C-alpha cells in the first residue's frame, strides 16, 4: 500500500509544528497503516520524547524503537493526561473525527491530522465552535492540517 503522506506534508509539519519543539515531548499519532508518518514523526521529534502510535489493527510495519505502538480505537485509548500534540489519520468518518478532536483537545492544545479533504466537515464543525478559540492552518500543497487552541 502506498502512502499519501507526501514530502509536502512533511515540510508543512516541520515548518508549522515540529520546529516548535527542542526539548523532549509526549505526542501521538492515530492511524499507522503504512508506517510512513510513524517513521517521519519518530525521526523528527526531539531525543528522549515519548511517541505513541495508535491503530485498531496491528499492521506489519517497520518502526523505530522509540515508537510505542498501541492497538486500540483512538476513542478508547487511555491516553496520557497531557500531550504536546496528536496527529489524526485513522478513521475519517465525520462523527468519529469530531469525537477525536473533542477528546484530544482535553489533553493538548494542538490537534493535527491528514486528509483534510476527507475530514473537512469535522474541521468546519470544530472551527465553528465559538466556545473554544481555535486557529486552523491549512496548506493547499498538502493534505495535513493543524488546529490550535489560542
Where are the predicted features?
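A short alpha-helical cap/connector motif
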Residues: 1-87, 91-150
